[in-house]
């Protein structure tokens, strides 16, 4: 009996399986969340690409595989908060389906308001509960102890993406999807999941079931975007941050006024290279998988006015706010005062 038990016991080492390494790959590590610029992700993407190519002709299987990988990617980035992706996906999918079957305008409006409440409610809870609590604490007991609320990575991006879908369906600009898998694929698609760009439903959904085709031009552009994005993020941004900006910002009194000024300019360059580097990598990864994303930055520091800068920085967000918020509020069509109020509200919500 003992002999049989020993025979059935798997010797993982003999099988060449490193359990510690397996645990590291499969579990979330808050100290080392998965990011595009990590060697681990790049190796994982190569393995992912092989399976992706094998499923080239099997569209549904490929969509399922990518969706599962996207959820795994988000789990490795934010831990158990990947369930929020599921909540947003299922609720907005069902609300949009219901909207399509509803004739009465007020009922359709209630459904889109419901979608807004779910998405913006989640966003405000995770981003602003502590902010408002800190402001109101003096009114209660004078002491502020921050609540233990973790900010899930990329929550702004996937909530805004999902809202673009329900709002477009409400406006009858888009027919709702009949497949939950297709919608889950759209919301969770890993290249833009954690740092954008915000890809609108009307631009992305028509690409989902198209035959997979990656031309040599797309492949070349994809590699270029990934390499340039990696250079911006891992070389320029990280180097400036560690060796320059953090030293000055941590002890500004030790440095001259001119050095502090250089620190401010260095920080401006750091955040641009960090953010646009991620966007470039996302655009490049999507191209390698056969998908097109909109550009997110257009040399913003070459802008000659604040308005021009707004048009060049985080373009997918500024155009989203313009089309779904500013124009919905009335834009500049209702007099000067109303225009200023609309602009302030748009900027305020843009800060989310």
Where are these regions (language model features)?
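Short, Lys/Arg-enriched N-terminal segments with co-localized hydrophobic residues
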Residues: 1-6
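Membrane-embedded transmembrane alpha-helical bundles that form the catalytic cores
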Residues: 8-352
């Amino acid at each position: 009996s003992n002999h049989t038990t020993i025979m059935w016991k798997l010797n993982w080492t003999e099988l060449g399986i490193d359990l510690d390494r397996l645990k590291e790959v499969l579990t979330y590590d808050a100290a080392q969340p998965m990011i595009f610029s990590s060697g681990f992700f790049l190796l994982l993407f190569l393995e992912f690409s092989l399976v992706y190519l094998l499923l080239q002709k099997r569209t549904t299987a490929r969509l399922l595989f990518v969706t599962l990988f996207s959820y795994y990617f988000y789990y490795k980035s934010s831990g158990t908060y990947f369930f929020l992706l599921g909540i947003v996906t299922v609720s907005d999918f069902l609300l949009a389906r219901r909207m399509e079957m509803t004739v009465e305008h007020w009922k359709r409006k209630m459904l889109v308001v419901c979608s807004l409440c779910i998405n913006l409610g989640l966003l405000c809870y995770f981003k602003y509960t502590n902010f408002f609590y800190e402001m109101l604490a003096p009114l209660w007991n004078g002491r502020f102890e921050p609540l233990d609320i973790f900010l899930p990575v990329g929550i702004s991006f996937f909530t805004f993406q999902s809202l673009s879908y329900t709002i477009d369906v409400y406006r009858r600009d888009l027919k709702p999807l009949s497949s939950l898998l297709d919608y889950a694929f759209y919301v969770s698609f890993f290249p833009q999941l954690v740092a954008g760009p915000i890809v609108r439903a009307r631009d992305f959904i028509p690409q989902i079931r198209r035959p997979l085709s990656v031309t040599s031009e797309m492949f070349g552009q994809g590699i270029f975007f990934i390499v340039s994005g990696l250079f911006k993020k891992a070389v320029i941004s990280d180097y400036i941050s560690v060796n320059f900006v953090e030293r000055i910002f941590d002890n500004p009194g030790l440095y001259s006024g001119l050095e502090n000024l250089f620190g401010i300019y260095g920080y401006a360059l750091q955040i641009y290279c960090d953010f646009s580097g991620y966007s470039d990598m996302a655009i490049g990864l999507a191209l390698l998988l056969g998908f097109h994303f909109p550009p997110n930055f257009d040399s913003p520091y070459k802008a000659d006015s604040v308005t021009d800068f707004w048009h060049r920085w985080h373009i997918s967000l500024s155009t989203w706010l313009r089309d779904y918020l500013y124009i919905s509020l009335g834009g500049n069509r209702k007099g000067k005062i109303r225009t200023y109020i609309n602009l302030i509200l748009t900027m305020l919500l843009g800060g989310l």
